[in-house]
């Protein structure tokens, strides 16, 4: 029965492993890029702006409209074909083709074309900003999983150490080298270590859930990250920390979150010109071709109406003309639109300055945080070395029976805490360095 249960457990574990999906950092970035809803919205915005930019060039061409009408006329009415008054009822039918070409409109068309192209650049910058943010969020979430994995490993290693020492202590107690009461302290420590493993596993599960939600994956899907090579931590320690002013100037000149305001200001300026052009005269070339039919039209002597096709052909007319429109009063709408355009420019300038100020503050803080993280990691390395030496010494004394179980378990806890602190300092330093890489447009991979 036990053998059967063991086989069932092994089969279940094998199935779970087979169903597990292994993902790399780059695969996570690709998944987030493909699945993120905000990015899909941004891509749709870019496509919308691109179509608007392409169609705006058609404004340079003349338009063409076809029209047709059919009327029943009663009472005293002018026949549109003969232009004679008729007192009887009759029916008329007409066709028109009209084309209008803009000759002058104060630059409205040319500025509209320029504006749609600029709006496309704004949409592109917005999408790039969203893409960079999503990629950075994936890096942060991936690092959180890596950190939780290492914390769980430390907790498991601590259990192994405590279990090993418990077995040794039992042998020493049986030999009379240490009192049996020392075993209780170590057993209590083992229970605490088991609780730490449960808590670490729960934190790991949470970080995996956060990562899956970011990647728009099913929360129940079983994934496992692969650990990238982060052995170049010493490079961060030894490399000079970039100057805050240099990093800030680069970010302000190149990051999409700032550059989008440059294009937005261009768009706002063109919008102001378009609003101002509404106060200028417009000149248009108009051409029209039309024809009419009336069932009340008769040729001399003959009492029957001309055939439909004959009238349509004979009544064909062509008109070419020029139309000039001079705006005099438009209920203040032109003035209001110009004022709103000015306010839009001011608002964009303020948003741009706020973004620049925020960027400088964030970069300065990020540089300070990186310096502090490097110092913390170096201190954590020294702390672990000292804790390891203290643990080795306490273990030797405990095995000789000259140290209490309390002293020994305390040394274990201090060493485990030092290991945890070093891991935390390592990932904090990597994270802080990646923030600087983000501002400098360097690769966010490891």
Give residue spans per PLM region.
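Sec/SRP-type N-terminal targeting helices
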Residues: 40-44, 57, 89, 103-131, ...
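Periplasmic alpha-helical coiled-coil/stalk elements that build and connect Gram-negative outer-membrane
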Residues: 133-250, 369, 373, 415
């Amino acid at each position: 029965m036990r053998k059967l249960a063991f086989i069932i457990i092994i089969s279940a574990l094998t199935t779970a492993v087979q169903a597990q999906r292994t993902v790399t950092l780059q695969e996570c970035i690709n998944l987030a890029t493909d699945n993120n809803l905000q990015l899909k919205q941004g891509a749709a915005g870019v496509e919308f702006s691109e179509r608007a930019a392409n169609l705006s060039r058609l404004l340079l061409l003349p338009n063409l409209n076809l029209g047709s009408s059919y009327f029943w006329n009663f009472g005293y009415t002018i026949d549109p074909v003969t232009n004679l008054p008729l007192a009887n009822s009759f029916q008329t039918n007409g066709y028109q083709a009209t084309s209008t070409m803009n000759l002058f409109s104060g630059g409205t068309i040319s500025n509209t074309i320029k504006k749609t192209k600029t709006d496309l650049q704004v949409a592109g910058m917005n999408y790039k900003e969203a893409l960079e943010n999503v990629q950075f969020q994936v890096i942060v979430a991936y690092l959180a999983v890596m950190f939780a994995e290492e914390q769980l490993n430390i907790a498991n290693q601590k259990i192994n150490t405590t279990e090993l020492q418990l077995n040794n202590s039992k042998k020493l107690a049986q030999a009379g080298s240490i009192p049996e009461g020392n075993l209780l302290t170590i057993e209590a420590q083992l229970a605490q270590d088991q609780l730490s493993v449960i808590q670490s596993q729960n934190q790991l599960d949470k970080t995996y859930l956060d990562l899956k939600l970011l990647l728009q994956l099913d929360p129940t899907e079983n994934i496992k990250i692969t650990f990238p090579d982060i052995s170049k931590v010493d490079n961060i320690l030894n490399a000079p920390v970039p100057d805050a002013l240099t990093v800030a100037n680069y970010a302000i000149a190149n990051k999409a979150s700032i550059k989008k305001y440059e294009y937005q200001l261009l768009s706002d300026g063109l919008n102001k010109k378009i609003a101002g052009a509404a106060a200028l005269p417009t000149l248009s070339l108009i051409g029209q071709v039309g024809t009419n039919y009336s069932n009340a039209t008769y040729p001399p002597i003959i009492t029957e109406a001309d055939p439909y096709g004959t009238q349509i052909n004979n009544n064909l007319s062509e008109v070419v003309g020029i139309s000039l429109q001079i705006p005099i009063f438009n209920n203040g709408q032109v003035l209001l639109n110009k004022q709103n355009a000015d306010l839009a420019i001011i608002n964009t300038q303020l948003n741009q300055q706020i973004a620049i100020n925020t960027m400088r503050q964030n970069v300065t803080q990020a540089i300070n945080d990186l310096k502090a993280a490097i110092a913390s990691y170096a201190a954590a390395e020294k702390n672990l070395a000292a804790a390891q030496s203290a643990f080795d010494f306490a273990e030797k004394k405990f095995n000789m029976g000259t140290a209490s179980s309390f002293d020994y378990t305390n040394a274990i806890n201090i060493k485990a805490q030092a290991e945890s602190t070093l891991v935390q300092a390592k990932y904090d330093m990597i994270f802080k360095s990646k923030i600087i890489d983000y501002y400098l447009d360097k690769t966010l991979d490891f």
